[in-house]
Design a protein with these regions (language model features):
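GHKL-family ATPase ATP-binding module
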Residues: 1-14, 36-37, 43-44, 49, ...
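Short conserved segment of the HATPase_c
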Residues: 18-33
Length: 319
């Protein structure tokens, strides 16, 4: 349950709840996140807890409440300084954690939340957590088909063929082609939207081209294969390394120790996309037709550009 009302953001989940003894430290002290508990939570975005601690420090009001098996603890802060600490027993609430905060206007000045941006983030979480319902300001969001739903909801035109949806251990992909130009990708790592891509997206782009060329036994130019593509990839990586704290670009070379990201993605698509195209001959025919059209258009444009350069060169020679 998520709400933004009068500039106060509130989030209530229904998981296990933060251990009551650790609640205050978990939201205010560094190096107290889940990663410091051993081998658990390896395929997560972080769990160092830096984000929640930063929000605490930069909020004029911050509340953390955890409920576990009939007991609860509520801790409040202001600018990161503890204000109160309350323990309760005999609580008839579902287990879970509640966080609310009001950003400090002395730090940020006047501000407003972009609710459309928040809504899109929530939609992304639904695609990656099948069947999990997110409630935001009175509206509910849930996905039953994962990345396939993402593609269907983000395409602005009818796809040339039914979107391809493939999934396996630690990977899920969805692929379609439209009639536009360029390439469009949505990539995720351990539930985090990587808007600037990274090693997983680079491997995905390479794998699509490699698999398609091998399927048709044609040495197509990769750009002709990928032009007009809209696709999504989600991978689960052990101890992911991002290129910045914002975690919008993955830098990990391996998906897990000893397994390279490139080989993992290339091998997955090499098997599953190839199998799909063999089983869906109509899709394979439509895709090949699109590739050939892209090739003709690219060569035609290249020819026009070459002629224009030659004309300009002749013109300069006569000046």
């Amino acid at each position: 349950d998520i709400s933004i009302e009068d500039k106060v953001v509130s989030v209530r989940d229904y998981g296990l709840g933060i251990p009551l003894k650790s609640l205050a430290a978990a939201v205010s002290e560094m190096n107290t996140g889940g990663k410091y508990g051993g081998s658990a939570f390896k395929k997560t975005v972080g769990l160092n807890g830096v984000g929640v601690k930063a929000v605490n420090m930069l909020s004029s009001e911050f509340t953390a409440r955890s409920v576990r098996d009939g007991e609860a603890r509520t801790v409040t802060f202001a600018q990161g300084l503890e204000q109160s600490d309350t323990w309760e027993s005999g609580v008839r609430e579902k287990n879970g954690t509640f966080i609310s905060f009001r950003v400090d206007e002395e730090v940020f000045g006047q501000y407003a939340y972009n609710l459309e941006y928040v809504e899109q983030m929530i939609r992304n979480y639904t695609y990656l957590n099948l069947g999990l319902t997110f409630n935001f300001n009175g509206s509910s969001y849930v996905s039953k088909n994962g990345l396939l739903d993402l593609l269907n909801e983000n395409m602005t035109e009818e796809p040339l063929y039914p979107p391809i949806h493939l999934s396996g251990d630690d990977i899920e992909v969805a692929i379609a082609h439209g009639t536009g130009y360029g390439e469009s990708y949505f990539s995720f790592v351990n539930g985090q939207y990587t808007s600037q891509g990274g090693t997983h997206q680079a491997a995905f782009r390479e794998a699509i081209a490699k698999t398609v060329k091998e399927f048709y036994h044609k040495d197509y130019d990769p750009s002709d294969i990928r032009t007009s593509i809209i696709a999504a990839i989600s991978v689960k990586v052990t101890d992911p390394v991002f290129e910045s704290q914002t975690k919008i670009k993955l830098g990990s070379k391996e998906i897990e120790p000893g397994v390279s990201m490139r080989n993992f993605v290339v091998d997955f698509l090499g098997k599953h996309l190839d199998d799909y195209l063999h089983k869906h001959s109509e899709t394979a025919q439509i895709l090949q037709k699109k590739i050939v059209e892209n090739e003709k258009e690219r060569k035609a444009i290249s020819g026009i550009q070459k002629k224009a350069r030659e004309t300009a060169k002749i013109g300069r020679a006569h000046v």
